[in-house]
């Protein structure tokens, strides 16, 4: 073998290793340069505000739903939705720590768990929304036939399936996220980053496609079909009301209107989820494409703001829910605090109204 061939053969593994390092996305690790403190302060302010609003909103929504005397399947699923939001925002302190230190100094365990828990909570959220829409559609059909809804054991099984499937679906992220040294643009030396390293490109492609399909598109299709069916039932019920004004019929319509109000709220939650989670899904797919197109540049700062936008969904969910379904409860709380006598009157008059609520029945 000629010296030129031997030198080329020896340099090939180095070039391959250098290319592999260049394709590793650093996610939250980023060298910000001279304005590091200012940028980190802005990022901290934004995420801290999202964290505070989300924590307060979800905890208050949890208390309002949990204090109802009767909690059905829908209420349990809504509680599950708020729990998933709380799990999702638990990643914010870790994200802020990395944005301040730039390098990953939290250890391998946190690296394995951070993106795993974020993906797990997102999967639980969309599956819960799909389960609520499907359960409400089935409940309305069974209500018209005089059939009772699922019992406590069925609810426990449903929640176990949602969390179990989400945990298994996100498991590859827990396995393949690891801490590696890498030199980032603007850095004088290598720093530790938490990045995703798949054994094969084929495995990464198959997981990305299957996860987006099964945990994003299919639940969205279930929600759309369920809402379409409920709209058909609601329109048919209103037409029957114009023909017959019997008490039983009017009572059935009142329940349908409450269901329609609940579905309108859940529809808003679903729309906000898809709007605020679509950018992160697209960004993850672009990171996958980066393996094939080296000229495609995705900055870690852009990834951070996309994730921050996704975090904001956890703050928006309880706001939408409280504004549309819990306005009377919040009015009662404020009146009890500022006007005790008026609050007592509202408390007495709202008992029967709460008993008629489908979400608590």
UniProtKB/Swiss-Prot annotation:
**Which tissues is this chain's protein expressed in?**
Highly expressed in lung and colon.
**Known InterPro entries for this protein?**
GPCR_Rhodpsn (IPR000276), GPCR_Rhodpsn_7TM (IPR017452)
Keyword terms of this UniProt record? Cell membrane, Cell projection, Differentiation, Disulfide bond, Endosome, G-protein coupled receptor, Glycoprotein, Inflammatory response, Lipid-binding, Lysosome, Membrane, Phosphoprotein, Receptor, Transducer, Transmembrane, Transmembrane helix
Q: How is it modified after translation?
A: Phosphorylated at two clusters of Ser and Thr residues located in the intracellular C-terminus. Prerequisite for FFAR4 internalization via an ARRB2-dependent pathway.
* Taxonomic superkingdom: Eukaryota
- Topological domain (Extracellular) residues are 1-45, 99-112, 178-204, 290-295
Which regions of this chain are Cytoplasmic-facing, per the record's topological domains?
Answer: 67-77, 134-156, 226-268, 317-361
- GO cellular component annotations, sorted alphabetically? ciliary membrane; cilium; endosome membrane; lysosomal membrane; plasma membrane
At which residues is glycosylation annotated?
Answer: 21
> What is the recorded function of this protein according to its Swiss-Prot or TrEMBL entry?
G-protein-coupled receptor for long-chain fatty acids (LCFAs) with a major role in adipogenesis, energy metabolism and inflammation. Signals via G-protein and beta-arrestin pathways. LCFAs sensing initiates activation of phosphoinositidase C-linked G proteins GNAQ and GNA11 (G(q)/G(11)), inducing a variety of cellular responses via second messenger pathways such as intracellular calcium mobilization, modulation of cyclic adenosine monophosphate (cAMP) production, and mitogen-activated protein kinases (MAPKs).
User: Member of which family?
Assistant: Belongs to the G-protein coupled receptor 1 family.
Query: Can you name this protein?
Result: Free fatty acid receptor 4
Q: What is the protein's species of origin?
A: Macaca fascicularis
Specify the taxonomic lineage: Eukaryota, Metazoa, Chordata, Craniata, Vertebrata
Q: Quick one: which gene encodes this?
A: FFAR4
């Amino acid at each position: 073998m000629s010296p030129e061939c031997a030198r080329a053969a020896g340099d090939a593994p180095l070039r391959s290793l250098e290319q592999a390092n260049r394709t590793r996305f650093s996610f939250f690790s980023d060298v910000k340069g001279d304005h590091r403190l200012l940028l980190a302060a802005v990022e901290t302010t934004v995420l801290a505000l999202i964290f505070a609003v989300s924590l307060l909103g979800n905890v208050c929504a949890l208390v309002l739903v949990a204090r109802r005397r009767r909690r059905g399947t829908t209420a349990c699923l809504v509680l599950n939705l708020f729990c998933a939001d709380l799990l999702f925002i638990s990643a914010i302190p870790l994200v802020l720590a990395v944005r301040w230190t730039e390098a990953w100094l939290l250890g391998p365990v946190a690296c394995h768990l951070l993106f795993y828990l974020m993906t797990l909570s997102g999967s639980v959220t969309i599956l819960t929304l799909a389960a609520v829409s499907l359960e409400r559609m089935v409940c309305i059909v069974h209500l018209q036939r005089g059939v009772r809804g699922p019992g406590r054991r069925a609810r426990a099984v449903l929640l176990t399936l949602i969390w179990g499937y989400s945990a298994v679906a996100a498991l590859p992220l827990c396995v393949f996220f690891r801490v590696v040294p890498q030199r980032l643009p603007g850095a004088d030396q290598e720093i530790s980053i938490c990045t995703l390293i798949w054994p094969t490109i084929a495995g990464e492609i198959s997981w990305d496609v299957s996860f987006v399909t099964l945990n994003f598109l299919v639940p969205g299709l279930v929600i759309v079909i369920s809402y379409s069916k409920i709209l058909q039932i609601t329109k048919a019920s209103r037409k029957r009301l114009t023909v017959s004004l019997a008490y039983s019929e009017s009572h059935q319509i009142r329940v349908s209107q409450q269901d329609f109000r609940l579905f309108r709220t859940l529809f808003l939650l679903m729309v906000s989820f898809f709007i605020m989670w679509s950018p992160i899904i697209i960004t993850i797919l672009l990171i996958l494409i980066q393996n094939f197109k080296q000229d495609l540049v995705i900055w870690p700062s852009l990834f951070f703001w996309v994730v921050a936008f996704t975090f904001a969904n956890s703050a928006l969910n309880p706001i939408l829910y409280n504004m549309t379904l819990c306005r009377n409860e919040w009015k009662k709380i404020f009146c009890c605090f500022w006007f005790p006598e008026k609050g007592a009157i509202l408390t007495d008059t709202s008992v029967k109204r709460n008993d008629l609520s489908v979400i608590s029945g």
